UniProtKB/Swiss-Prot annotation:
Efficient DNA binding requires dimerization with another bHLH protein. GO terms for biological process: auditory behavior; cell fate commitment; cochlea morphogenesis; craniofacial suture morphogenesis; exit from mitosis; genitalia morphogenesis; hard palate morphogenesis; inner ear morphogenesis. Expression restricted to the embryonic nervous system. It is found in: Nucleus. The gene is Neurog1. Keywords: Activator, Developmental protein, Differentiation, DNA-binding, Neurogenesis, Nucleus, Transcription, Transcription regulation. This is Neurogenin-1. It comes from the Eukaryota.
């Protein structure tokens, strides 16, 4: 009988060991669960915290971004205002410089015309020549002086010299030798010129640019007469190439 008893005791020991192992395993599972629960709670709290952290940082950065954007806009507005003011000042300075240049140019032109009038034959005090009239008168005066010098160098009589100087179509228009009395009357009254002078004169040509200005100052012959020069030569001067 001792053998079956020993076997029973051994069976009981095995069963008790098995139950204790089961209990130990159960307890270890409970302990693991108890340990896992705090870990899960801490991890669950940490994950939303991590997720909410960028949101909080973004919310905190929104006012800073708005401030930076406003500052940039202010800087741009200031730059635009400065650039517009600078452009306005540059345009104004350029306009002032252009006006100064134009004023200086007109002053120089008027001074040159006054100097030219000072060397031309004198006119009555109430006579005022325009710019184009002054230039044409100076051109004709220079031409008359040059022809007078050429005639004096050649030593030819006045009539034959005129016939040699004038083109053939103007020779029949030459007047005869005037008497001293008629010459004096013509100087005082301003007699009409020859047909060639009437047709080709740049001073009385209606097609000239300053014809309207030339006609406003009365007859052309006494105005553009040259004292000390033969009057017939002056009447025939328009037969040369017109001044343009």
């Amino acid at each position: 009988m001792p053998a079956p008893l020993e076997t029973c005791i051994s069976d009981l020991d095995c069963s008790s060991s098995n139950s204790s192992s089961d209990l130990s395993s159960f307890l270890t599972d409970e302990e693991d669960c108890a340990r896992l629960q705090p870990l899960a709670s801490t991890s669950g709290l940490s994950v939303p915290a991590r997720r909410s952290a960028p949101a909080l940082s973004g919310a905190s950065n929104v006012p800073g971004a708005q401030d930076e954007e406003q500052e940039r806009r202010r800087r741009r507005g200031r730059a635009r205002v400065r650039s517009e003011a600078l452009l306005h000042s540059l345009r104004r300075s350029r306009r002032v410089k252009a006006n100064d240049r134009e004023r200086n140019r007109m002053h120089n032109l008027n001074a040159a015309l006054d100097a030219l009038r000072s060397v031309l034959p004198s006119f009555p005090d109430d006579t005022k020549l325009t710019k184009i009239e002054t230039l044409r008168f100076a051109y004709n005066y220079i031409w008359a002086l040059a022809e007078t010098l050429r005639l004096a160098d050649q030593g030819l009589p006045g009539g034959s010299a005129r016939e040699r100087l004038l083109p053939p179509q103007c020779v029949p228009c030459l007047p005869g030798p005037p008497s001293p009395a008629s010459d004096t009357e013509s100087w005082g009254s301003g007699a009409a010129a020859s047909p060639c002078a009437t047709v080709a004169s740049p001073l009385s040509d209606p097609s000239s640019p300053s014809a309207s200005e030339d006609f406003t100052y009365g007859p052309g012959d006494p105005l553009f007469s040259f004292p000390g020069l033969p009057k017939d030569l002056l009447h025939t001067t328009p037969c040369f190439i017109p001044y343009h």
